[in-house]
Amino acid sequence: VTELAKYAKEKGIGLIPAINSPGHMDAMLVAMEKLGIANPQANFDKVSKTTMDLENQEAVGFTKALIGKYMDYFADKSKIFNYGTDEYANDATNAQGWYYLKWYGLYNKFADYSNSLAAMAKERGLQPMAFNDGFYYEDKDDAEFDKDVLISYWSKGWWGYNLASPQYLASKGYKFLNTNGDWYYI
């Protein structure tokens, strides 16, 4: 990665490193269990294979420490750090993870988690970036999110997956990087 970062700098190419959480954490969840962290997965209709339980403080602490190490590494190699936040527990909820977070009163925990990662990026001089999914789900102000986060807008949602519209997020002052998943393979 150091060699790639050096090459990119020589060519004037910006890198955007990404560590996706609290979803898409398959390998990290397996590693947590092997390291003795009990039940790091979200559990709704079934246990998620991809998403961390935001109420498991040991899992959250481990994840923040790991992401912090990557942020430290990239602080002098990149201007932006994408910390993910998309598709929360879709594998455990029939693609309704955000709905479940709201139903169980956990949506503010997600916002707090997202905001803490944004703060970590800013402390290191990095522009925080996150995918749009969980920000103001259903165009509602059920929680507050850091306004400095650059939104990587990848999906407008699909049936029953009611993501905030670009217009709604723009009205709140967010800036975007268009990463629309309909136009390329992610």
Describe each region flagged by the PLM.
Residues 88-91, 96-186:
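Catalytic-core regions of glycoside hydrolase
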